[in-house]
């Protein structure tokens, strides 16, 4: 979708705008994109995979992830570990005080979207998990193959930085 890439661009917010402008008929995006479309009255939620809509396997098609390169992990493992610790700490802080999301949202989103972020985060908090299980990975891997996004299966250990597994549990 034009305009949906680049630093600081929210795919979901951009998708909701494209829907509002009549450039697209629908989208599959994050909670913020769906929330914007529903609250503005320009869209409806058809499926919410995290809440059991659609095939059971669809639950594994959508989750937040922190991505980096193998090169960075090999070159600066402590930097990668620090990023994981920051993610775990942030998820814990949001679980303790979801309104922190609004404070941060004001720095990244337009005013309307920033006003929604605490509601979106609160709804998704039960699904916040800093780790990616083998089962979730397998579901995503099958989805990527079925959609033609990957040509061959990947191995869990090739994609998920399991060397940081112990950090996932620290809260």
What residue ranges belong to the model's regions?
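A local structural motif
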Residues: 1-10, 14-25, 114-116, 150-156
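Residues that cap or flank secondary-structure elements
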Residues: 7, 25-26, 132, 139
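Pocket-lining segment of extracytoplasmic ligand-binding domains
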Residues: 14-107
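Short loop/turn and capping residues at structural boundaries
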Residues: 30, 48-49, 117-118, 155-156
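Short secondary-structure boundary/hinge segments and terminal tails
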Residues: 36-37, 54-56, 123-125, 160-164
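Secondary-structure end/capping motifs
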Residues: 74-151
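Conserved C-terminal helix/tail region of periplasmic/extracytoplasmic solute-binding proteins
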Residues: 142-171
């Amino acid at each position: 979708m034009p305009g949906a890439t680049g630093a600081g661009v929210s795919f979901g917010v951009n998708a909701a705008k494209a829907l509002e402008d009549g450039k697209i008929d629908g989208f599959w995006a994050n909670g913020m994109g769906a929330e914007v479309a529903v609250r503005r009255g320009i869209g409806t939620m058809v499926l919410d995979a995290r809440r059991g809509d659609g095939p059971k396997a669809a639950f594994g098609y959508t989750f937040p992830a922190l991505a980096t390169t193998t090169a960075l992990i090999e070159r600066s493992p402590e930097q990668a570990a620090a990023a994981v610790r920051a993610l775990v700490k942030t998820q814990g802080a949001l679980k303790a005080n979801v309104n922190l999301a609004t404070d941060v949202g004001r720095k990244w989103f337009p005013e309307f979207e920033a006003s929604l972020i605490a509601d979106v985060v609160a709804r998704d908090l039960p699904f916040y998990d800093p780790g990616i299980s083998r089962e979730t990975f397998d579901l995503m891997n099958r989805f990527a193959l079925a959609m033609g996004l990957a040509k061959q299966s990947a191995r869990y250990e090739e994609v998920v930085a399991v060397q940081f597994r112990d950090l996932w549990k620290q809260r």
